[in-house]
Amino acid sequence: VFFDGIVVHVRGADAKVSPHTIYVALGIDLEGKKELLGLWIAKTEGAKFWLGCLTDLRNRGLEDIFICCVDGLAGFPEAIRTAYPQARVQLCLVHLVRAALRYVATKDAKAVAADLKKIYTSPTVASAEEQLEEFAKVWDAKYPTISKQWKSKWTDMISMFDFPEEIRRATYTTNAIESLNSAIRKFTKNRKQYPSEHSALKLVYMAIREASKRWTRPIKHWKQALNHFAILFPDRMPKDYQA
């Protein structure tokens, strides 16, 4: 399950416009197909808000999650571990790289992105740590914040190394959530603000519904990943599942 947020501007009852975030839960089912699981809107969030979202998913029938890919949102990993104790939490690589590049001059962006890629495409945790240290040696003089942030989030970044390459390719490096965000932005780009939270949710839902018409095939590398899931989590697969 991928969790992500889109910022919108909503006019309140007092006629003041304020930023809200619409949070999207995008699931990959056992057939490897994308599915919208939930939409929520809020001005602020924290562990209590996230636990409410996850409880909503559980009450609507989402029994188990193998992997949760999330942005570095405060309180979210803890809420996931409360609602779905067996789920593995992984910080979204797309967001980590994007956040890092905010600090980088345009002329350095390509080289920095390439060196960051060496970290998250490493075959093991040990080699990833070596690449992170190498990154720090090369770039800390100009951009010390990047390696500092990655080191502070390292625990929730490295769970992917517990899985074989097939699962990593199908999940952590997929552009599923990024392509959905692009579709939403394209659909909503001409709206500067919304008269209510409901209207904002409605337009984002319509954008996702339009995008979902193309969700007819499994994501890349899914068959190989699913076979590994069946081996790693035999007791958590549906009883009628056949590889």
Placement of each model-derived feature along the sequence:
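A generic short alpha-helical patch detector that favors 3-5-residue windows
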Residues: 17, 42-46, 68, 89-92, ...
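A detector of single, family-specific signature residues
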Residues: 30, 41-44, 50, 58-59, ...
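Amphipathic alpha-helical interaction elements
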Residues: 42, 59, 81, 85, ...
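Conserved, well-ordered core segments of regulatory domains
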Residues: 1-13, 22, 69, 90-93, ...
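Mobile genetic element proteins and their domesticated derivatives, centered on retroelements
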Residues: 4, 25, 34, 68, ...
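RNase H-like nuclease fold core
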Residues: 1-70, 74, 78, 83-86, ...
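Acidic/histidine-rich catalytic cores and adjacent linkers
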Residues: 118-243
